[in-house]
Regions:
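Bacterial N-terminal signal peptides
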Residues: 12-24
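Local beta-strand/beta-hairpin segments that build beta-sheet-rich folds
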Residues: 51, 289, 339-340
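Active-site-adjacent loops and short helices of periplasmic peptidoglycan-processing enzymes
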Residues: 28-177, 187
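N-terminal secretory signal peptides that target proteins for export/translocation
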Residues: 1-9
C-alpha cells in the first residue's frame, strides 16, 4: 500500500498519541523474587509468530493454567465418544480432600461431566479437577502422564504435568511459550468448545458461582484461564480478537490479580496496535512511536527478549480500553460481542441462547440465573 508522506506522518502521530512504552526501572532487578517468577509472551494465533516475549522459555509454575490441558483432554474424550457430557463424575475421598479452591462436594457425591467442566473453568475447583482426571483415566497419576504425553505431541517441549489441577508439586512445570502454544492448540483442535472459557459465572444446583477472570468483560477478550498458587504468583492465559486478528497472551508471576490484569490488558492492546501498524505498511516498533516513558508497572522488566527485523511488541497503551462517557448508563454496543465460531449451526444457536445468562454485566441483566 502506497501512502502519501503527509498521510504517513499523520498516521505516525496518531499512533504515537495512542501508544506509550512500558519501561523497566533503571535499577536492574534480575535477582528479585518478582523477576524470578515473571514471564510473558504474546503470539499471533493464526501464524504462531511471537510478538512479544520475556523469559518465555523459563520454567515456571503454571498453577491453574494446568486446567486448560485437563479440559483439552476432556474434550478429546468427548469427541472420541469415550465419555458423554451427561456421564456422572464421582467425587472420591482423595478428590474431596484437595485443598482450595474447591467446589466442596463430599466423597461419593456426583456431578455431570459438563457440570464438572464448567465448574473447572469458573471456580477453578481442585477437587473437581482430580475427580475429572480419575473419571477419564482411572487415577490422577495416569491422567497426568496422558497430559504430559499430549503436551509433547503438541510441541510443548518444556512442560511436565504431575496433577490435573496445578497445585504445587515438585517437577510440575511449564513455560509461558508452552502455555501460549497450548492455547493455540485448543483453539485449533476444539474451536467449538473454546467458548467454555468465556464464562464470567456459572450456576451449579441453584448456586451462583462467580469467576475470577475479570478481563472477560473487556471488548474483544473472549476466554481462557487465571491461575494462582504462592509459588507461581498470579498467572493468566488469555486470547482476544480484533479486526479479524487473534492474539494469545500469557502473563506469569504477577504480584496481584489487579497488577496482572492491568499488565495483560495493556499488552493485548499493544499487540493489536502493533498488528494495525503492520497492516498500514509500516515497519516500526512501538518504541519508535514513543515520546515519554510511562511509570513502571509491578514487574521488574518488560523489554522484549526477541530480536527481529519485524516489529516486536515492546510497549503497552496508557489506557487499555476507552471508558464510557460519564452519565451514560446504557450498556456497551452489541456490535462488539462475538459469540464464537462454530462448525455446527445448532451449537452456535445453543451458545447464543446461553450468552446472556453467563454474562449478565455485559447485557445489564443483573445477577442472572
Amino acid at each position: 500500500m502506497i501512502l502519501s508522506s503527509r498521510l504517513r506522518l499523520a498516521l505516525i502521530k496518531l499512533l504515537a498519541a495512542m501508544v506509550v512504552m512500558v519501561c523497566a526501572p533503571a535499577q536492574a532487578m534480575a535477582d528479585s523474587p518478582v523477576e524470578q517468577r515473571f514471564a510473558a509472551i504474546v503470539i499471533d494465533a493464526q501464524t504462531g509468530e511471537t510478538l512479544y516475549a520475556r523469559h518465555a522459555d523459563a520454567r515456571r509454575y503454571p498453577a491453574s493454567l494446568t486446567k486448560v490441558m485437563t479440559l483439552y483432554l476432556a474434550f478429546d474424550a468427548l469427541d472420541a465418544g469415550r465419555v458423554k457430557s451427561a456421564d456422572p463424575v464421582v467425587i472420591s475421598r482423595r478428590a474431596a480432600a484437595r485443598p482450595p479452591s474447591r467446589l466442596g462436594l463430599r466423597a461419593g457425591e456426583r456431578l455431570s461431566m459438563r457440570e464438572a467442566m464448567d465448574v473447572l473453568v469458573v471456580k477453578s475447583a481442585n477437587d473437581v479437577a482430580t475427580a475429572l482426571a480419575e473419571h477419564l483415566a482411572g487415577n490422577e497419576a495416569a491422567f497426568a502422564r496422558a497430559m504430559t504425553a499430549k503436551a509433547k505431541s503438541l510441541g510443548l517441549e518444556h512442560t511436565r504435568f504431575l496433577n490435573a489441577s496445578g497445585l504445587p508439586q515438585a517437577g510440575h512445570f511449564s513455560t509461558a511459550r508452552d502455555l501460549a502454544l497450548l492455547g493455540r492448540a485448543f483453539l485449533r483442535d476444539h474451536p467449538d468448545d473454546y467458548t467454555i472459557f468465556d464464562q464470567e459465572q456459572t450456576v451449579f444446583r441453584g448456586r451462583l458461582i462467580q469467576g475470577h477472570n475479570r478481563l472477560l468483560s473487556r471488548p474483544g477478550i473472549d476466554g481462557f484461564k487465571t491461575g494462582f498458587v504462592n509459588a507461581s504468583g498470579y498467572n493468566l492465559l488469555t486470547s482476544g480478537v480484533r479486526d479479524g486478528r487473534r492474539v494469545i497472551a500469557v502473563v506469569l508471576g504477577g504480584r496481584s490479580a489487579r497488577s496482572r490484569d492491568a499488565f495483560m490488558a495493556k499488552l493485548v492492546q499493544a499487540s493489536f496496535s502493533s498488528l494495525a501498524i503492520r497492516s498500514a505498511g509500516f515497519e516500526l516498533t512501538v518504541a519508535d512511536l514513543m515520546a515519554q516513558p510511562a511509570a513502571p508497572l509491578s514487574y521488574a522488566s518488560v523489554a522484549s527478549d526477541e530480536v527481529a527485523s519485524r516489529p516486536v511488541i515492546q510497549a503497552a497503551l496508557t489506557q487499555a480500553e476507552p471508558t464510557t462517557a460519564q452519565g451514560d448508563a446504557s450498556p456497551p454496543s452489541r456490535l462488539w460481542v462475538q459469540v464464537g465460531a462454530f462448525r455446527s449451526k445448532a451449537r452456535g444457536q445453543a451458545r447464543l441462547a446461553d450468552v446472556v445468562k453467563r454474562h449478565p454485566r455485559r447485557f445489564g441483566s443483573g445477577r442472572g440465573t
